[in-house]
């Protein structure tokens, strides 16, 4: 199973002071050396990663570059110009802290955007909610890749296996009793397994991402149809204490151990 290292949160730290430190390109070099892919989200408002970040990373890094972006003409044209290995199309709201859900597959521009990117020899992935309907639509749209949104799984795991429900970060919608949460958690995990199998059956390559960390990744790794995980915030958070190289290698070890032991 491959690890795409999302380095957005390195850019978050840089933009907090609007300086050149930490250097996103240096982070990309470390991610390229110890991970399998660099993932970067260039948002419409450029609140974190900037155009020059993407340009420099594509120019100087040999690893595959996975650009996450919305259906925004300016950024899509940037992708067509710079030609990352892959573009993952994601939904985007200006007020959100992080991507809140899967892409709406009924968007009028979606099919045309996919065709333009593929005609430029750029692989296209769709970041979708884990539903059979969205997987079938992704196949109809002729995407090569799908990335299953694991946010709900991650939130349920947090509610069950951490103290988050007793903190300011508790989610009101997950304020149920443990038994109910456990049932929902098992159902969501089964749904991810079913969706990954369906995607593979349809000839789609299947990735997963959002909210994955060192504690909840193990069960996802057991889903053999998933070939890639894109993980960012938890790796960058761990790197504050261990360094980026060690944080990436620790996640790689978790993925390797789970895959080889099952």
From Swiss-Prot:
Functional description taken from the UniProt entry: Catalyzes the complicated ring closure reaction between the two acyclic compounds 1-deoxy-D-xylulose-5-phosphate (DXP) and 3-amino-2-oxopropyl phosphate (1-amino-acetone-3-phosphate or AAP) to form pyridoxine 5'-phosphate (PNP) and inorganic phosphate.
Residue numbers annotated as active site: 41, 68, 210
Enzyme Commission code(s) on record: 2.6.99.2
Highest taxon listed in the record's lineage: Bacteria
Gene Ontology cellular-component terms listed: cytosol
Signal peptide: none
Name the UniProt record assigns to this protein: Pyridoxine 5'-phosphate synthase
Keywords assigned by UniProt, alphabetized: Cytoplasm, Pyridoxine biosynthesis, Transferase
Family that this chain belongs to: Belongs to the PNP synthase family.
Pathway of action: Cofactor biosynthesis; pyridoxine 5'-phosphate biosynthesis; pyridoxine 5'-phosphate from D-erythrose 4-phosphate: step 5/5
Gene3D superfamilies with a match to the protein in the record: Aldolase class I (3.20.20.70)
One Gene Ontology term of the molecular function aspect: pyridoxine 5'-phosphate synthase activity
